């Protein structure tokens, strides 16, 4: 008797899917190979990891215009992660940005295994979530904070859910560490995390002490850097150089950060339709409602960012905040609502809607994935050094400075 086994890709569908995402990521990154990545937002990487360590311990910053401020909190993380790549730290940012989609899909699939037993829907959900990194425009814009936040968000949700269900100290510490890491790159994640922990403590009273410890750890690790931003009302939205990031309400509702490299808002329409329909089945409505609350919270953050302006430096012109992280959380919540309600399509009452639902479900990853591979992740991201001009200089008109005098009378 000869037993023919199915092909490897059919026996291991998720591994095959991840392999395909890695290949697609390399194809999409074809235009940014060869040099450290830079953009208006993403500063050029240091020539050596030792320069990141210098930022942590030197008394004043001797780069650019010079500064007496302490280094951003994310420099601590980059310094540690860059040790294995000591003489090529630019490779670290390259890996984080180019491979962000498969990385986010992997963490999403891990969380999906906790909340869904439907393999097909879970895989589609994980791939769709991973594509949020490019749909929002975070990858092509060099918004490293949003990329890190979207990659770690499913891991945070996974451990937080386990903490609420089984209150123990190891996951409480892990949650605090994740809050610190994500907030270091995307400071707006800190108030979101505090609100989330407070709501979880209200709902799950037995885990209140562990959740409080998570909040303390996440806040303490950020240290004075966080409180400096609270007291001086400085940049809250994204790591890197503060640049103008205009986004309309329609763009935020479509999951876009409003930058050049963001996808069209129409790609998200099938997802929104499915998320609204997910509210209909009563047996899954409670879980779907929780996902909708998360989604609406992200939408509020995105809309708030789209109308918020700030001066990055004293005397600098106002710039609009980056709304990509809130837009990404908005779509992530909608996707999760669909995943929660998906088992109802196997029941007799909703079985006739299975084919239309599947068609709508696969539209988002097909369109977003195809757009990602064809367009690539360059523009404005590039592999050549960008000449960065301070915002207060770029906003001013060109002037001419005339120097007269000699070595005796002096320069006037």
Question: What is the role of each PLM region?
Answer:
Residues 171-186, 198, 217-220:
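Membrane-interface alpha helices of multi-pass inner-membrane proteins
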Residues 342-369:
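Signature aromatic-anchored transmembrane alpha helix within multi-pass, membrane-resident enzymes
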Residues 41-45, 135-147, 242-251, 287-352:
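Membrane-helix boundary/interfacial segments in multi-pass membrane proteins
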Residues 360-412:
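Extracytoplasmic
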Residues 29-155, 159-163, 169:
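Active-site lumenal/periplasmic loops and adjacent helix-entry segments of GT-C-fold
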Residues 163-181, 208-212:
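Short hydrophobic alpha-helices at membrane interfaces in multi-pass membrane enzymes
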Residues 1, 54-61, 214-287, 384:
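Periplasmic/ER-lumenal interhelical loops and adjacent helix-loop junctions
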Residues 192-219:
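Perimembrane helix-loop-helix junctions
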């Amino acid at each position: 008797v000869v037993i023919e086994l199915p092909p490897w890709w059919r026996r291991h569908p998720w591994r095959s899917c991840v392999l395909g995402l890695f290949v697609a990521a390399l194809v999409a990154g074809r235009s940014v190979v060869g040099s450290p990545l830079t953009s208006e937002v993403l500063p050029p990487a240091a020539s050596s990891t030792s320069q990141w360590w210098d930022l942590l311990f030197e008394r004043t910053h001797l780069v650019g215009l010079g500064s007496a401020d302490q280094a951003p909190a994310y420099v601590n993380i980059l310094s540690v992660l860059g040790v294995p790549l000591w003489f090529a730290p630019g490779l670290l940012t390259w890996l984080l940005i180019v491979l962000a989609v498969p990385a986010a899909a992997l963490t999403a699939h891990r969380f999906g295994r906790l909340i869904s037993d439907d393999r097909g829907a879970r895989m589609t959900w994980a791939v769709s979530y991973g594509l949020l990194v490019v749909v929002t425009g975070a990858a092509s814009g060099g918004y490293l904070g949003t990329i890190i936040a979207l990659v770690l968000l499913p891991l945070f949700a996974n451990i937080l859910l386990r903490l609420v269900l089984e209150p123990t100290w190891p996951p409480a510490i892990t949650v605090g560490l994740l809050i610190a890491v994500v907030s270091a790159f995307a400071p707006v994640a800190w108030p979101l995390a505090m609100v989330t922990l407070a709501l979880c403590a209200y709902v799950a009273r037995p885990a209140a002490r562990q959740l409080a410890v998570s909040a303390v750890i996440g806040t303490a690790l950020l240290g004075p850097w966080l409180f400096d931003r609270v007291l001086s009302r400085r940049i809250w939205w994204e790591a890197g150089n503060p640049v103008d990031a205009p986004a309309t309400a329609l763009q935020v509702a479509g999951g876009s950060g409003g930058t050049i490299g963001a996808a069209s808002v129409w790609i998200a329409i099938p997802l929104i339709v499915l998320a609204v329909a997910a509210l209909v089945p009563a047996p899954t409505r409670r879980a779907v409602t929780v996902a909708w609350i998360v989604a609406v919270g992200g939408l509020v953050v995105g809309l708030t960012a789209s109308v918020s302006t700030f001066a990055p430096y004293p005397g600098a012109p106002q710039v609009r905040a980056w709304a990509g992280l809130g837009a990404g959380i908005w779509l992530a919540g909608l996707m999760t609502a669909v995943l929660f309600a998906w088992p109802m399509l196997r029941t007799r009452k909703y079985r006739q809607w299975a084919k239309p639902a599947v068609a709508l479900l696969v539209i988002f990853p097909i369109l977003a994935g195809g757009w990602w591979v064809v367009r690539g992740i360059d523009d404005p991201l590039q592999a050549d050094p960008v000449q960065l001009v301070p915002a207060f200089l770029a906003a001013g008109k060109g002037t001419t400075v005339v120097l007269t005098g000699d070595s005796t009378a002096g320069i006037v």
